[in-house]
Amino acid sequence: MRSTPHWKEAVVYQVYPRSFMDSNGDGTGDLNGIISKLDYLQQLGITLLWLSPVYRSPMDDNGYDISDYEEIADIFGSMSDMERLIAEAKARDIGILMDLVVNHTSDEHPWFIDALSSKNSAYRDFYIWRAPAADGGPPDDSRSNFGGSAWTLDEASGEYYLHQFSTRQPDLNWENPRVREAIHAMMNRWLDKGIGGFRMDVIDLIGKEVDPQIMANGRHPHLYLQQMNRATFGPRGSVTVGETWSATPEDALLYSAEERQERQELTMVFQFEHIKLFWDEQYGKWCNQPFDLLRFKAVIDKWQTALADHGWNSLFWSNHDLPRAVSKFGDDGEYRVVSAKMLATALHCLKGTPYIYQGEEIGMTNVNFADIDDYRDIESLNLYQERIAEGMSHEAMMRGIHANGPDNARTPMQWTAVHMPGLPPVSPGLRLILTSGQWNVAAALDDPDSVFYHYQKLVALRKQLPLLVHGDFRQIVVEHPQVFAWLRTLGEQTLVVINNFTRDAVMLAIPDNLQSQQGRCLINNYAPREQLEPIMELQPYESFALLIERL
């Protein structure tokens, strides 16, 4: 019998280093700060630690613009600090996932600097160049994800280079085999240091077809990833998760279906359909649409079903680019604690590998800065100017930034109730959220009923109960507009998971075959439920999971 891959049993914790923990009082989180909190992460129970980029970078896009893949940015520490982090994490049975950003580099990377020196540079075709249009303007109307044209003119050569993000993030030319070979060599040097794998930034963009303007999921991304797998992480059994904003379930199976041995691409992918579901067709996330649980359930069900037997889901509510989970899907006011617990139960009781973003485990919330100058995210700042120029009001754009702006996730981790050494007060240029003394790690660890201990219990249950890893998923009460509920089944065991996604008390009719069933309540955010009454009154954001040994 084939053993279970370790990544299926894992729980991943994401750290955004700039705002996690500052060890030297300079206002920026760093590697030694992360090392100092490994015991905290071990207490939570996680087994993989994903680091947002710590490589050398001019920080135009908070480290996602890399100028040297094999050096550490001075603000974060040194390579010896990085090697100590890898070793100290491993001593606690925690693997490190490095953020691999290889769709593009910084414009300060030596490859790009050399490419600018001459059209005959050996590195010119490491990047994507086109002649101007007939009028001297950009080659086509492709848009950058950060606003404006995706093409910038190099005046010295008279050619434009492609950048799907900032003008300072030129796209690499993955059609060039020398690019692929250089990236493989770099990856292997990191794997040799003992990391556990990679999270791959916007990896669905590497196979772009530039001239037809197919910027995601083009002809060759799967070929490139199969080559990468064979040359780097595949033989080592490393964990790989690809960020794929455009992926459908069919795409996800191509990237990650484990039984397709001839493909051998990634472990799993991040898909974002549940995140983009309530974005506006014209203005995207900057014009948020009302949450609709029925539509939300349908998307989660689609992915759980499509990847049930052949692929694997990455389970997440938030990350460094997204709003805080409790503000997005719960209630960050009166019901902050119970809704944070409900969201935790819902996520960790689905089938897949759960991801926890820093601060999620204590119920951190969105920011609500009134002034655009208080924000630092380049996407928010650029798109603010672009949308205002197009006629959107300041108030409307600020509502979009408050709801979905990346800086919601990038404020300092709240370790204590007041500023102390080790708590970056402005990192990365953002103010600390001034909240009550209860919204911090120190208070959470002192409160046995805190959100932290709810997460800790869920992480422990995953290690104890194979059903949570392997059990089948089937949604129940599908048409209920306020409740998301499902069954997980493995052998004779059935786990009934019920979540009220609203601030209202809700009456729920239990399906006939489950009525009066008794079991063991594994997790709850109100009083334990040990029997499924025919009609149950659920409290605001109530959530529980009931294990029935034989249905």
Swiss-Prot record:
Pathway in which the depicted protein is active: Glycan degradation; palatinose degradation
UniProt entry keywords in alphabetical sequence: Carbohydrate metabolism, Glycosidase, Hydrolase
pH and activity: Optimum pH is 7.0.
Source domain of life: Bacteria
Reaction equation(s) it catalyzes: 6-O-alpha-D-glucopyranosyl-D-fructose + H2O = alpha-D-glucose + D-fructose
Residue positions of the active site: D201, E243
Pfam family, any one: SusG_C
Coiled coil: none
GO MF, one example: alpha-amylase activity
Annotated EC: 3.2.1.219
Thermal dependence of activity, per record: Optimum temperature is 30 degrees Celsius.
Enzyme kind, highest EC tier: hydrolase
Keyword Zinc belongs to the record: no
Induction remark: Down-regulated by sucrose and up-regulated by palatinose. Part of the palEFGHKQZ operon.
SMART domains: Aamy
Record GO biological process: oligosaccharide catabolic process
Family the UniProt entry places it in: Belongs to the glycosyl hydrolase 13 family.
Function: Catalyzes the hydrolysis of palatinose. Shows a strict specificity toward palatinose, and cannot release glucose from the disaccharides sucrose, maltose, trehalose and melibiose. Involved in the degradation of palatinose, a sucrose isomer that is formed as a reserve material under conditions of excess carbon availability, sequestered in a form unavailable to competitors such as fungi or the host plant, and whose consumption appears to be postponed until the preferentially metabolized carbon source (e.g. sucrose) is depleted.
Record's protein name: Palatinase
Species the sequence originates in: Erwinia rhapontici
Phylogenetic classification of the source organism: Bacteria, Pseudomonadati, Pseudomonadota, Gammaproteobacteria, Enterobacterales
Gene from which this protein is expressed: palQ
